[in-house]
């Protein structure tokens, strides 16, 4: 890789990382807006992970990404002391704890939707009167229902009330947001498997044992997992959820860079072993 191509590659890579940091703010703004409807009595400490699962998840994933970038690209093997290596492992372990916790936040959102019940005695939204009702536009988006806009949300005749909330949605909308919640859960679960494999890859590469059958199984598994993640991104794109679509593709690019780092790291180790063997044979 020439110097110019090297600079362009790194500029593109760190631009992707910076955009992912921006997404932390975008998801927080989305979660904050939804929390005013989801938690009408205020967000209690126990509600934080459910109400802000996206923002917490994205923030910790960015930290985890930077940890992998440090070990696989920025820090040279010769300059990584045992203390630095242990520190990176501990930081990543803490990130994994929070990521698993966030996964249960996505699961809680899905289970919450299962509690939606038919709103009896209501055949159109305008009949709800002047009470503080909101329409569930998306998984994390609510719109206040007023006399001026009540007829614009849905022409359905059957509506569902979300458990414990003055928020309603029609049958088609409930199906859509439930499917989106399923995709969130599947996406989060698959990413957990991806990062588990990547952690194993890094640990084996540290010991120069990332080769043979283990290497082939890792590559095959990640091919399947990344394909599922790509399908999730496409689904969000089809459903018009731009932020999730955009975020999903950025993460695929970001971890493609980490995979390239691991490949180059392995190649450097092989070249070093070959050079050492050649020197010893002279």
Where are these regions (language model features)?
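N-terminal membrane topogenic signal
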Residues: 1-15
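Juxtamembrane membrane-water interface segments of multi-pass membrane proteins
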Residues: 2, 70-86, 111, 198-214, ...
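Transmembrane alpha-helical segments of multi-pass membrane proteins
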Residues: 13, 83-99, 213-229
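C-terminal transmembrane-bundle signature of multipass membrane proteins
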Residues: 17-25, 190-207, 223-278
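Membrane-helix interface motif
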Residues: 24-39, 107-122, 151-165
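Membrane-interface segments at the starts/ends of alpha-helical transmembrane spans
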Residues: 39-53, 127-137, 154-183
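Membrane-helix interface and helix-disruption motif detector
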Residues: 45-56, 111-114, 178-186, 236-247
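Central hydrophobic cores of alpha-helical transmembrane segments in multi-pass inner-membrane proteins
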Residues: 58-74
